[in-house]
């Protein structure tokens, strides 16, 4: 038993750790309805909490069903996670053009001034490939996410711009799993 525990602990030491700008890929064994076959972008991580958005679970509604009279009305909305499902969040590539944005990785930003986003949409200065909207978010308390990673619920990987913004979502999880763990590719 000690040998097995030591091997597991040793493997955990060499895994990528959770931090802002990394993605979490759910293991096939994670059968939670919300996180089943999920890819989550961590937008915030510290000793007290972790926050992220699920990149690959689109809802059946578009932006025009929430906000009236805006261009890009056919923009799909994604399920960000099970927390505060009535809240609207967004990631984008526009940086300081949207005041109060927080950089997640090079070229990807979280949030910012929503009135500016609406104005940029009306001015047709935002394209579909530059912004994504989410309802709700994914959240973990202190050490909860680290424990889930240690228990093999998540694979941690460095996020890339094209993963966050320019990817066809239905196959995102399976494509990543194929590159990370061949034994899970059939899932």
Provide a role label for each language-model segment.
Residues 1-14:
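Short, Lys/Arg-enriched N-terminal segments with co-localized hydrophobic residues
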Residues 15-134, 138-187:
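A short aromatic-anchored loop/beta-hairpin motif
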């Amino acid at each position: 038993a000690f040998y097995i525990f030591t091997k597991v602990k040793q493997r955990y030491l060499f895994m990528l750790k959770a931090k802002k700008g990394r993605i979490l890929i759910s293991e096939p064994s994670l059968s939670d309805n919300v996180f089943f076959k999920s890819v989550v972008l961590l937008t915030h991580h510290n000793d007290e909490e972790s926050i992220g958005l699920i990149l690959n679970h689109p809802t059946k509604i578009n932006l025009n069903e929430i906000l009236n009279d805006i261009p890009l009305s056919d923009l799909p909305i994604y399920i960000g996670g099970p927390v505060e499902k009535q809240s609207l969040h967004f990631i984008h590539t526009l940086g300081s053009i949207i005041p109060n944005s927080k950089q997640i990785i090079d070229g990807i930003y979280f949030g910012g001034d929503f009135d500016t986003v609406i104005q940029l949409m009306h001015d047709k200065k935002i394209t579909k490939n530059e912004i994504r909207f989410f309802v709700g978010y994914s959240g973990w308390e202190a050490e909860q996410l680290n424990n889930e990673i240690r228990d093999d619920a998540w694979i941690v990987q460095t996020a890339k711009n094209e993963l966050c913004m320019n990817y066809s979502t239905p196959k995102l999880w399976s494509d990543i799993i194929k590159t990370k763990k061949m034994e899970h590719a059939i899932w």
